[in-house]
């Protein structure tokens, strides 16, 4: 007589038991069996499995949306950029067609000479350099004007160009007691080049016995004393520097 409520069959676990590998089965076949055993059941709560290509597709979609937004925002700026590039090309074409390199250089030299003459006239009309002594017109240079002119004068008054260059490259007066290279610190390359040209020009003129200075006596009202004014290329080059 059988007892009620007792199941004669043994209870089976809901967890799939690992399948035994048959003799002679290949590793690929075993991998397929494991995949079928793991993926055969349903996910709880009505969840569904995500396909492997879903995440890359979402990334591609977001990337396309960002590109569309960026293009929409940058379209006006791209138009301006293209317009400026086209205008720049047209200007270069006009310059190459109308102004060759020699013509451009000639115009630049002519404008530089006019600017130099303007400065000379301006300083003469404003401060009367021709009626000032050397010390007085040097004192009219203010701040950086006097600083740069002092280095220029150091080079041209040195016994030789190399000695003057060494003096400004090992300067102790500007930031005493430190020794600094003023050529590198204050970018004195224009002053060095002009001083070299000045010394070369003066040397050539002295070699041929040509005068480079014009001197005259200036009589001033007392208590100012009479002095000898000197006009030379040093003063003219000073205007170019300041």
Swiss-Prot record:
InterPro entries: Dpy-19/Dpy-19-like (IPR018732)
Protein keywords: Glycosyltransferase, Membrane, Transferase, Transmembrane, Transmembrane helix
The enzyme's E.C. designation: 2.4.1.-
Gene Ontology molecular function terms on file: glycosyltransferase activity
Gene Ontology cellular component list: membrane
Record keyword Magnesium present: no
Keyword Metal-binding: no
UniProt tissue specificity: Brain, heart, placenta and testis.
Bilayer disposition of the protein: Multi-pass membrane protein
Subcellular location(s) per record: Membrane
UniProt-annotated stretches for the region Disordered: 1-56
Transmembrane region(s): 103-123, 149-169, 190-210
Domain of life where this protein originates: Eukaryota
Other remarks in the entry: It has been suggested that DPY19L2P1 is an inactive pseudogene from which DPY19L2 has evolved by duplication. However, expressed transcript sequences derived from the DPY19L2P1 locus are known to exist.
Role: Probable C-mannosyltransferase that mediates C-mannosylation of tryptophan residues on target proteins.
Family statement drawn from the similarity comment of this UniProt entry: Belongs to the dpy-19 family.
Protein name, entry field: Putative C-mannosyltransferase DPY19L2P1
Organism, scientific name: Homo sapiens
Encoding gene (name): DPY19L2P1
